Regions:
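Sec/Tat signal peptide C-region and signal peptidase I cleavage site
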Residues: 23-27
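Bacterial N-terminal signal peptides that target proteins for export
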Residues: 2-13
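Bacterial N-terminal signal peptides
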Residues: 13-21
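Sequence/structural signature of beta-propeller domains
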Residues: 28-372
């Protein structure tokens, strides 16, 4: 049967439209699942700006994302929960020594506080706790929830000999951040070049990109590929967006965000040494009087503030520091606050911290004014 010119045109139009529909269907984001999340571990949590909460379960080799409900009452200016460790332990029905707060994140809309908690002993358990505006603690069930999930395919297998004796399988995910539609996940992999940054487009498609990271370690006098990032954030330096990362013992290095996205292996630029025997536990970016700053909480030092101006002028460090506790590189302001174990932004006036009181040993969740 012959087909005239108009018939061929119609056929071509139909085929083009059909191809467009098929392409659109292929590009459609995956729908969330409905069911139970059974965590084997919980080492890191973070939000995106829409209130999606991401949960890292390295022992279960998964990262999950769940929608969270926001509070309707006005956001508080301040929040204080004294003896937070005792309250968490009481909620779990265990002694204080058997409950550990491993991470904290502030809901970007409601300003409610979310805690990642591990209960040790038998059976061990990882769970989420939410703190409302009045300081009340509520355990969150992960049963019958809508969620997204993606696999961590490169984490060290149980029984793997790790590069350092103090490394653990939980360090497969040490920190996470949501940047420009992607979840960045730092930690150890099961590969010889073990320090890694993974990227997952959200909603998850179970596909990821990763780059193996290397830095010059200013306390250890060597280029290291097995030191995991302890904490990191996106931060502009010299007009370009970078990942600013803190390492144990305790260099601070930058990685170009563009280079992270376009390389399989990448050597960062070490900009500062905060002193040996220390671990940066958290860092956040904030503005004060029109200037950009990074605030770093440390395990064995005071809090430290670095300015964007000083980071812009930072020169690469490529030689060992002359002593075990010597600092070097980018200048910082030492803040007279110690014992800060968790740190996040709260509002325009305050941070939220979990801090060990050096006078009585209590562990408290509280707001800290941005006066510096």
């Amino acid at each position: 049967m012959k087909t005239n010119h108009h018939g061929r045109v119609k056929t071509m139009v139909v085929m083009i439209l059909l191809a467009s529909v098929i392409t659109g269907l292929k590009a459609a984001p995956p729908a969330p699942k409905k069911g139970n999340i059974a965590l084997k571990s919980l080492t890191s949590i973070t939000f995106n700006k829409d209130g999606i909460l991401f949960l890292a379960d390295p022992l279960g080799t998964h990262v999950y994302a769940i929608e969270t409900q926001s509070a309707t009452q006005p956001n508080p200016d301040k929040l204080n929960v004294a003896n937070i460790d005792e309250k968490v332990a009481a909620l779990l029905g265990v002694q204080v020594k058997d409950a550990k707060i491993v991470d904290m994140a502030v809901h970007p809309i409601s300003k409610e506080i979310y805690l990642a908690v591990t209960r040790t002993g038998s059976p061990a358990q990882s769970l989420l706790i939410k703190i409302d505006h009045k300081g009340n603690l509520q355990p969150l069930t992960l049963n019958n929830v809508s969620f997204y999930e993606t696999s961590l395919t490169d984490v060290p297998a149980p029984g793997t000999k790790l590069p350092k004796e103090w490394h653990s399988l939980n360090m497969a995910v040490t920190d996470m951040a949501f940047i420009d539609g992607e979840l960045f996940v730092a930690g150890l992999s099961g590969e010889q070049f073990s320090s890694k940054m993974r990227r997952f487009v959200f909603p998850f498609t179970n596909q990821s990109q990763a780059v193996q990271l290397e830095i010059f370690h200013t306390s250890h006098d060597t280029y290291e590929t097995h030191s995991p990032i302890e904490t990191f954030l996106p931060f502009p330096i010299n007009g370009q967006m970078n990942i600013l990362a803190g390492y144990g013992c305790s260099p601070v290095a930058k990685f170009s965000l563009q280079d992270i996205r376009s390389n399989k292996q990448l050597r960062g630029v070490t900009l500062a040494e905060l002193g040996g025997g220390n671990r940066p536990v958290d860092m956040i970016a904030y503005k004060k009087d029109g200037k950009d700053y990074v605030l770093i909480a440390n395990s064995d030092r005071t809090m430290m503030r670095m300015s964007s101006e000083d980071l812009d002028k930072g020169k690469p460090l490529t030689t060992v520091v002359p002593g075990a506790y010597v600092n070097a590189g980018v200048n910082y302001l030492a803040i007279a606050e110690v014992g800060v174990m968790q740190l996040d932004d709260f509002n325009d006036k305050s941070f939220i911290v979990i801090q060990r009181n050096i006078n009585d040993g209590s562990l408290n969740l509280k707001t800290m004014e941005k006066w510096f």
